[in-house]
Amino acid sequence: MISTLRSALLALTAAYAFSATSAAPAAAQTTKIKMVLNWKYQGPQGMFFLADDKGYFKQEGLEVTLDQGNGSGAGVPLVANGTYDAAFGDVNALIELAAKKPDDAPIAVYVMFNQPPFTVAVKADSPIKTPKDFEGKTIGGAANDGALKLFPAFCKLAKFDCAKVNITNMQPNLREQMLMQGQVDGVFGYVNTIRFSAKLMGVEDSQLRYINYGDYGMDLYSNAIIVSKKLAKENPKAVAGLVRAINRGLIDSLKDIDASVAAVAKREPLIKVPVEKDRFIATLQSEMNHPEIATIGLGNVDPERLKKSIDILVDASNLPRTPAVSEIFTPAFLPEAKDLPKKLF
């Protein structure tokens, strides 16, 4: 099975490589790329801004606009409908779209979050101890939150009744406030997003607990660089350059975390730098540091693991079809294996 999956990915890589040579421009020109990030400007996004500040995008012939996002799931449809050329978005939202509208779905080209960050946060003294305890309770989340979108799959895997859980939507900036004020019993999100947003409100780690999806069989990839199929087909050189520049920015961020967070503060002066530095370190530790990177490198995927992720979502969410691994991710635009980070610390 693994060899079959790898063969499929290699075939797709060859197809994109052919496009890259046949579509190469006759003369150097600047390509504009609009990219939406996963959330408001925060510490873990420093690699994108370092790539910009150090001229890595420019060296690749790119002019990249990096906009704030409204959730990891929100970027995928924005790339699909042409509003953006690229996104830092959730692979699982991509799988769902590919299952429903394969012709519209974009494709992941560099997977950055290789450990599942999805969670429901509750107050430390909450009676909610297990997923079954969600029944009869109210959980809130932003409409495009990745954990909210995956909740039906979580219900099935963790064996509790989604129909007995009251779901309410809220503005992202009100999430932690509504939880601590008791307006909801739990909130959807990424562990570190909630944890550090709560810190900014003065909430200590000891005041929160997390019911993590990954503890109940949802071994999923998460955020990735996602591009439109149109861009990948018509300008593969630009996609490869985008990935190469971001990878260089990430390597620089790992070498100098302070500089990485400073690049974020340059765009959003109101951030609390010490908190955002801690947020970035925690993200590296818990969302980007899967043991597989020692072998395949950060940015790449294990095809068999990704296939299992696809199967989990298709089955649990009753999706109409099962996308192939090659529909979700292509390694065609990755830098050479020697240039991918194999160790984060």
Predicted regions and their residues:
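Short, glycine-/small- and polar/acidic-enriched structural segments
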Residues: 28-181, 185-192, 211-213, 218-219
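Solvent-exposed, polar/charged alpha-helical surfaces in well-ordered, non-transmembrane soluble domains
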Residues: 55, 77, 81, 95, ...
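Periplasmic-binding protein-like
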Residues: 112-122, 204-231, 243, 282-288
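Secondary-structure end/capping motifs
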Residues: 233-316
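Conserved C-terminal helix/tail region of periplasmic/extracytoplasmic solute-binding proteins
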Residues: 304-345
